[in-house]
Design a protein with these regions (language model features):
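C-terminal catalytic/acceptor-binding lobe
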Residues: 136-247
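Short beta-strand-to-loop acidic/aromatic patch adjacent to the donor-nucleotide binding site
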Residues: 59-70
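Conserved catalytic core of nucleotide-sugar-dependent glycosyltransferases
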Residues: 72-152
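Active-site nucleotide-sugar/metal-binding loop of Leloir-type enzymes
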Residues: 47-61
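A short, glycine-/small-residue-rich helix N-cap motif at loop->alpha-helix starts
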Residues: 40-45, 165-166
């Protein structure tokens, strides 16, 4: 077993997060390597490190850690245990979205994520065979709505002149969900850091002020009574071509 740590930084990262990643790797005890992205936009920062990790034939699991995560002690061992014991192909830890605040994962009643951030996510190497390249893309905005006890998932194609942030993680997770190999939700949560005050460069005593969010104030779920059809994709002919879902 070898862990490929994928850090999709666009140029900055909290030193505490790096410290926690190394702590977790040492505690887990498996072989590992870290793959970096520097000064690349979304989704390139995700695709670059994914390609690097998969190019190493010894890497068995890709651990995505975004640059602002708060990793509790034992999180890597805990999530790897869940992945192996349950035979999952991917597992994600929920964490608070600081601007809301709320959790970052929508899950079905069986614990599968159909809408998920990837701040702390482990993906088995074999899971990527269910997706076509590019594995990460941000040209689709997803709109979720409840319609007659169905979750309607409607894509909106992003035009070149539109301003959009993210969605690469949503498309990645939703593609796996529709393939029947969803990202499962870990029972252990992470936190998120945010820089609230930049240290004054004119004083040695002026350090950066960083706030940590660790409480999930809102659990996002979608449940129906005795209905196995938990998700329904809107009827768009070219949807598979646009999100690269393979049969």
């Amino acid at each position: 077993m070898k862990i490929g740590v994928c850090i999709p930084s666009r140029g900055t990262i909290y030193s505490q997060t790096v410290d926690e990643v190394i702590r977790e790797l040492k505690y887990f005890g498996a072989d590992w390597d870290i793959f970096w992205s520097h000064a690349n936009p979304i989704p390139d920062c995700f695709n670059i490190i994914t390609d690097q990790a998969l190019a190493d034939n010894e890497v068995t699991h890709l651990w995505y850690v975004e640059e602002d995560m708060v990793l509790p002690k034992g999180i890597l061992k805990h999530m790897m245990g869940e992945l192996v014991e349950n035979g999952w192909g991917a597992v994600a830890s929920d964490y608070p979205l600081t601007q809301a605040p709320s959790s970052t994962i929508y899950r079905d009643p069986y614990g599968a994520a159909y809408f998920s951030g990837c701040g702390c996510t482990i993906v088995k190497r074999e899971t990527f065979k269910y997706l076509n390249k590019p594995y990460w893309r941000s040209d689709i905005r997803w709109n979720l709505d409840l319609e007659h006890d169905y979750l309607s998932v409607k894509p909106e194609w992003i035009k070149n002149n539109q301003s959009v942030y993210g969605f690469q993680d949503i498309t990645f997770g939703l593609s796996l969900y529709l393939q029947g190999h969803p990202i499962m939700v870990s029972s252990m949560n992470c936190g998120q850091r945010i820089l609230t005050h930049v240290g004054n460069k004119e004083s040695n005593n002026a350090h950066h002020v960083i706030k940590e969010y660790n409480d999930l104030t809102e659990l996002k779920t979608f449940s129906v009574d005795n209905n196995p059809n938990l998700i329904e994709l809107c009827n768009i002919d070219d949807i598979q071509d646009r999100i690269h879902v393979t049969q």
